[in-house]
C-alpha cells in the first residue's frame, strides 16, 4: 500500500468524510468519493480495499487531529491538571464539531466488527497520556501506586463518553461548562494527592 501521508490519500480521505457526512455510508459511492477527491477510481483501491475500509482511516484521522489539537495548546511545562483541563476542553470542542463523523465511525466499526481496530487507533493517544500520568506521579501531582496505563484509558474514555453523551445523546440538562467542570473535579478527587 502506498504511503498514507501522500497527498492523494489525504484528498481521498477528506472527500470521503465530506461525501459520507452528506449522503451517509450506504448511499455514498466510491465514484462520488473519487470524483470529489479529483482522483481516479483505481487510485482509491491503492489505499483502501473497500468503502468500509475508510471508517478506521477516518477514525484514526479524527483521533490524530484531537491529539494534535491538545498537544498544540501545550508548551511542555504544564502541570498534570492543566493538561487534563486542556484534554477535556479539546475533546468537547472536537466532539461538537465532528459529532456526525464520530457517529459514522462508531457505526462503521461496529458493522465491521472491528472494535480491536479502535485499540490500535487509540494506542498513540493512550501512550501519550500514560507518559503524562507517569510524570505526574513522579512530580507527586497524583496519587502514587495507580496503574498509569489503565488510568490513561479510563480518563480518555470517561471524557469522550461524557462529551458524546452531551453532543450526540443530547444529555444537556446543564450547560457544557458544568459538564467539563464536573469531569475535571471528579478526576481531581479521584487522582489527586491529599
UniProtKB/Swiss-Prot annotation:
Source organism (scientific name): Bacillus subtilis (strain 168)
GO molecular function, one term: DNA-binding transcription factor activity
PANTHER family per UniProt: ACREF/ENVCD OPERON REPRESSOR-RELATED, TRANSCRIPTIONAL REGULATOR, TETR FAMILY
Keyword Repressor tagged: yes
SUPFAM superfamilies: Homeodomain-like, Tetracyclin repressor-like, C-terminal domain
Gene Ontology CC terms, in alphabetical order: protein-DNA complex
InterPro entries: Homeodomain-like_sf (IPR009057), HTH-type_Tx_Regulator (IPR050624), HTH_TetR (IPR001647), Tet_transcr_reg_TetR-rel_C_sf (IPR036271), YvdT_C (IPR041603)
Domain HTH tetR-type, residue spans: 6-66
Name of this chain's protein: Uncharacterized HTH-type transcriptional regulator YvdT
One Pfam match: TetR_N
Residue ranges of DNA binding: 29-48
Keyword Repressor in record: yes
Domain of life, per lineage: Bacteria
Keywords carried by this UniProt record: DNA-binding, Repressor, Transcription, Transcription regulation
Amino acid at each position: 500500500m502506498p504511503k498514507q501521508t501522500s497527498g492523494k490519500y489525504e484528498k481521498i480521505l477528506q472527500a470521503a468524510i465530506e461525501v459520507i457526512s452528506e449522503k451517509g455510508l450506504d448511499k455514498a459511492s466510491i465514484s462520488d468519493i473519487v470524483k470529489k477527491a479529483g482522483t481516479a477510481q483505481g487510485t482509491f483501491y491503492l489505499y483502501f480495499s473497500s468503502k468500509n475500509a475508510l471508517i478506521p482511516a477516518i477514525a484514526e484521522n479524527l483521533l490524530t487531529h484531537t491529539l494534535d489539537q491538545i498537544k498544540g495548546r501545550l508548551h511542555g511545562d504544564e502541570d498534570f491538571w492543566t493538561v487534563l483541563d486542556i484534554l477535556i476542553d479539546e475533546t468537547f470542542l472536537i466532539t461538537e464539531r465532528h459529532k456526525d463523523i464520530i457517529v459514522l465511525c462508531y457505526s462503521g466499526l461496529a458493522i465491521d466488527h472491528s472494535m480491536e481496530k479502535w485499540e490500535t487507533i487509540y494506542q498513540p493517544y493512550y501512550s501519550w497520556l500514560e507518559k503524562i500520568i507517569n510524570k505526574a506521579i513522579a512530580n507527586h501531582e497524583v496519587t502514587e501506586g495507580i496503574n498509569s496505563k489503565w488510568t490513561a484509558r479510563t480518563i480518555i474514555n470517561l471524557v469522550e463518553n461524557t462529551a458524546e453523551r452531551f453532543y450526540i445523546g443530547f444529555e444537556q440538562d446543564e450547560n457544557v461548562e458544568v459538564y467539563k467542570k464536573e469531569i475535571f473535579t471528579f478526576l481531581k478527587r479521584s487522582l489527586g494527592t491529599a
